[in-house]
Design a protein with these regions (language model features):
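N-terminal pro-sequences and low-complexity stem/linker regions of secreted or lumenal proteins
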Residues: 432, 447-929
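Intrinsically disordered, low-complexity, compositionally biased regions/tails
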Residues: 10, 124, 148, 175, ...
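Predominantly soluble domains enriched in secretory-pathway, periplasmic, or organellar proteins
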Residues: 16-467
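Short alpha-helical segments used as structural interaction elements across diverse proteins
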Residues: 2-3, 249, 300, 725
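A detector of low-complexity, intrinsically disordered, Ser/Thr/Gly/Pro/Ala-rich segments
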Residues: 13, 23, 245, 381, ...
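Bacterial N-terminal signal peptides that target proteins for export
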Residues: 1-11
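Residues at structural and domain junctions
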Residues: 8, 34, 43, 49, ...
């Protein structure tokens, strides 16, 4: 048993488990993932580590080499450059070839497409650009296909085949970072590509992801031979073409439409779209699309297989008439909830066996496709985290995964910093390596039962998720309040809690700055083994509200977070538009939905404050334009003021007197929900992410409505507290040290007090008997932690929490975002949304108290001492770099640079300590009670 430091008070320890890994056998270890699932490592096929997030693999025509496209964030080993790796299949030697054109600040990125030339002498890779699509600046390529010469398995850049802007059709308009794009044109942003037999050598068919089209070009000259428009209407992009596949004779091809729930059949010689084949489209136009992604032609080209990542299915299409004959079910045995994400395909040479990479199940499903009446898999092969590509080579199945074995501690200095002179801890996105495994198929056939059982265990489908047993028997909880904050690790805040597993040397915002969260943890329970499922805000807010992401999220966020060569297509926006308002699916939406949809379907009341809501600010509008500056609905005044400057009078809806804040506060013009279920279920006066808008005002607005809920309960008239309340309190993100913005300490202290005030109000109200409050960060990307880069703070607060102020509780159970979501669902009687939350054990130990937790009293010290009002000066460390950062939306600033600035601001010249722990602990117990 691990020993903990002594404290001035006794601590009630609920359960002791290891932090991440347990010894399963002398050969294997069980690794816990932030997805709540587990891996047995090493897994089948002796995986080798690769650069970050491989998305495509391709076998050379002679079968000697496997090329691997790594289009993630980049790792220290690759100098943070994207790369193509080459595996020599005879020797098993893996060599990586980073491309200097794809460094962390590059104006282009790899994106999905990889193919060998027909003679194996060249390798083609799609290269896409948003920030310099023209390729005008030195070192910038623009959009096109990078061509590499291959000699003895070694790559060297040979030429670049540029793609011009795609013409728009009549009435169409381009709405994806359209600034700088020529009129009547669209940015092609090449994705999947295929080599096509041409008259004079190789041609290339390229999916143009942002232009909603496909183009056939000469592989040498780049001359456009045919162009195919694939838009569903006038908005470009809307269908987002993903991949292409062509017949051997070069006459026909198919293009999968990521957001179109379809594939388009193309006549390559005639230059026509033969037909569009719908594949499990949504019932409503704005519901999630089926995500047609990877495609594969059978060896005899009579069947086309299409992975539908958002439907847990693979479509089997007869190429003779374009009809979908059947759909293969990629779910695991006994799986009743969705969420497997089939996103890659491979087939045996005899056409009998189809291999499907289930990204969300960490497994490959194996189908006998000649058994026409059967649609379920024969068995499953376990993989490392998030398989993204598969290929068959002889008796081997080659499997690439996007996230390998995850992260680990990030408490030391970055060995090879991306930005010299700005040393910081390793950034979570640069710690995620992919992997490539070689599984012997004959052996997997023999071991299929054992392998399938391992997949079921890894997906927690053989265990019990537990029940919440209150001391008095009946579940008293009728209301849940869920608070989502931004980006902090456990050690940054709670590393100073002596009786839990923290590292004091990593504390940046300890008890003096976050007294309320410390007090809450000590009263209601310290969770020192909690992990955020998301890596960054782009996927973190999806994880935190849907208990899953989408394959679109996973394949784009690392590009967004490396050099901004993709838009932040999350939280209800894609490019320059809101899909809901455009009447089309949001490509980022998981098919299994969000919490608010689950609540609506089961007739529970809910209200949302700031999450998946877009605020338009008066600072962005013309003065005196009509807007709702936070006034009650139906009484919209104009934006008479854009902001409140220091010392100016506060507007009535924000308080009385003069502003005590030393920085200007923007005013709300109006709010727009980005999801249909949030219409009429959001507070129009509550701000979204903007970190210069104090969390005190957000708390004020919620408490204004909460006062009405209390009155309604006391009088029995009016609207009472909804069953579910979602609050976004984002200011612990900070605005760095930008002059004239709140200091990091001010932002974090402001956020802390807002949390404390909400809990104080609820716990001193009639709702205390039947309300539970949950608090987490959407991700933990903005700090160091000595256990794992995903480890973060979480609070579970109710009258039924165990422990007392004299004997605080410490819970060492392994928990993630998914456990927290499943617990909220269980308390409200909601079914799970998907296979993730369905099998994540509930946080039952946190409701074993005697219903005697007293009301909470907030700590106002940092209001009274003025900390929350302070602004950065021009002399603050990192002020010049912070001044160039965008803090209007989540993570628009370079998080790695921001982290270095925040460390300097908090710790001065103190160097980061070396990692004290590894992710492999001595023992682990997964509780099922």
């Amino acid at each position: 048993m691990q020993m903990f430091r002594r404290s001035a008070v006794a601590w009630f320890v609920l359960t002791l488990v290891s932090l991440a890994v347990a010894q399963s056998t002398p050969q294997q270890q069980e690794l816990n993932l932030p997805s709540s699932k587990t891996l047995q490592v090493p897994g089948p096929g002796a995986p080798q580590r690769t650069n970050s997030f491989p998305t495509a693999i391709a076998l050379s025509p002679d079968g000697k080499y496997l090329a691997i496209l790594n289009n993630g964030r980049g790792t220290p080993e690759s100098k943070f450059e994207q790369s193509i790796a080459v595996l020599e299949l005879t020797s098993n030697q893996l060599r990586d070839f980073p491309d200097a054109r794809l460094g962390v600040d590059a104006k282009q990125t790899y994106f999905l497409g990889l193919a060998w030339s027909s003679d194996g002498s060249e390798l083609y890779a799609s290269m896409a650009s948003e920030s310099d699509p023209h390729g005008r600046n030195a070192g910038d390529t623009g959009n096109g296909v990078a061509v590499y010469q291959v000699r003895d398995g070694a790559l060297s850049p040979e030429r670049f085949v540029k793609l011009d802007f795609a013409p728009l059709g009549k009435g169409q308009h381009f709405a994806y970072n359209a600034k700088g794009i020529p009129k009547r044109k669209a940015n092609p942003y090449p994705a999947g590509l295929a080599v096509v037999k041409g008259r004079d050598g190789d041609d290339l068919l390229v999916a143009e992801n942002l232009a909603d089209g496909a183009v056939l070009i000469d592989a040498r000259s780049g001359k456009v031979l045919q162009r195919f428009g694939l838009t569903r209407g006038n908005l470009v992009p809307s269908n987002l073409p993903y991949g292409v596949v062509a017949t051997r004779n070069g006459s026909r091809a198919w293009c999968s439409l990521w957001n179109g729930s379809a594939v388009a059949e193309l006549d390559l010689r005639g230059g026509k779209v033969v037909r569009t084949i719908p594949l499990l489209p949504p019932e409503k136009n704005i519901d999630p699309s089926s995500h047609a992604t990877a495609m594969l032609l059978s060896p005899d080209e009579s069947r086309l297989y299409v992975a539908l990542a958002n439907r847990d299915a693979v479509a089997v299409i007869a190429t003779s008439d374009g009809k979908a004959e059947r759909y293969l079910d990629t779910r695991l045995p006994g799986q009743t909830y969705g969420g497997t994400f089939p996103n890659a395909l491979a087939q045996s040479s005899d056409g009998k066996t189809l291999y499907v990479a289930n990204a969300s199940s960490d497994a490959v499903a194996v189908f006998d496709v000649l058994a026409r009446s059967k649609t379920s898999a024969e068995y499953f092969i376990p993989t490392e985290w998030y398989p993204t590509a598969v290929a068959v080579h002889g008796d081997e199945l080659l499997i690439a995964t996007g996230k390998g074995q995850g992260t680990g501690p990030n408490s030391g200095w970055e060995e090879n910093p991306e930005h010299p002179g700005k040393r910081s801890h390793p950034y979570i996105a640069t710690m995620i390596r992919g992997s490539i495994a070689r599984v012997h198929l004959a052996e997997s056939e023999r071991e299929q039962k054992k392998l399938t059982e391992e997949v079921l265990r890894s997906n927690l489908m053989e265990g019990r998720t537990g029940e919440i047993a209150f001391q008095r028997g009946i579940n008293p909880i009728r209301h849940v309040i869920y608070i989502i904050k931004e980006n902090r690790t456990y050690d940054q805040l709670f590393g100073d809690i002596a009786s839990a597993n923290g590292d004091p040397s990593l504390v940046m915002y300890g008890e003096a700055i976050t007294p309320n969260q410390h007090k809450l943890a000590k009263q209601f329970g310290v969770l020192d083994n909690f992990y955020d499922s998301g890596e960054v805000s782009g996927d973190g807010h999806v994880w935190s509200t849907s208990a899953i992401t989408s394959d679109y999220t996973e394949k784009t966020w690392e590009i967004v977070y490396r050099s901004k060569e993709h838009e932040y297509d999350y939280e209800g926006y894609v490019g320059d538009y809101m899909p809901m308002n455009a009447g089309i699916p949001d490509v980022d939406d998981p098919a299994t939905g969000y919490l608010w949809g689950n609540l609506a379907r089961h007739n529970l009341t809910y209200r949302n404050y700031g999450e998946f809501v877009s605020t338009t600010w008066c600072t962005d509008m013309e003065q005196n334009s009509p807007a709702s500056t936070g006034a009650p609905s139906g009484h919209p005044p104009s934006c008479g003021r854009r902001e409140v400057k220091p010392g100016e009078d506060l507007p009535p809806n924000l308080g009385t007197g003069k502003s005590p804040y030393q920085f200007a506060i923007p005013l709300i013009a109006y709010n727009t929900p980005t999801k249909p279920e949030l219409k009429d279920h959001f507070d129009p006066n509550y701000a979204d992410f903007q970190v210069e808008y104090p969390d005190q005002f957000r708390a004020d607005e919620f408490l204004r409505e909460f006062t009405g809920f209390v009155k309604a309960r006391e009088t029995g008239t009016g609207n009472q507290l909804p069953n579910f309340v979602l609050l976004r309190l984002p200011n612990d993100h900070t605005a760095g040290t930008r002059p004239g913005s709140p200091t990091p300490n001010a932002s974090v202290a402001d956020n802390d007090l807002a949390v404390g005030r909400v809990v104080e109000a609820v716990s001193n109200s009639p709702y205390w008997d039947d309300t539970a409050i949950f608090v987490l960060e959407d991700d933990a990307q903005s700090g160091a932690d000595h256990v794992d880069a995903h480890r973060s703070i979480a609070l579970v607060i109710s009258k039924y929490s165990p422990g007392t102020a004299q004997q605080p509780a410490v819970d060492h159970h392994f928990y993630t975002t998914l456990n927290l979501i499943h617990t909220m669902e269980a308390l409200l009687g909601l079914p799970p949304m998907n296979n993730n939350d369905a099998h994540a054990p509930v946080m039952a130990p946190l409701f074993t108290g005697a219903a005697e937790q007293p009301a909470f009293k907030a700590d106002y010290r940092n209001r009274d001492n003025g900390m929350i009002y302070q602004a950065n000066t021009r002399n603050a460390p990192g002020a010049k770099a912070s001044a160039k950062m965008n803090f209007s939306i989540a993570d628009a600033a370079d998080t790695n640079v921001l982290n270095a600035i925040l460390w300097k601001a908090a710790k001065g010249n103190v160097p980061m300590p070396v990692p004290q722990h590894t992710v492999f602990a001595e023992e682990k117990k997964r509780d099922e009670d």
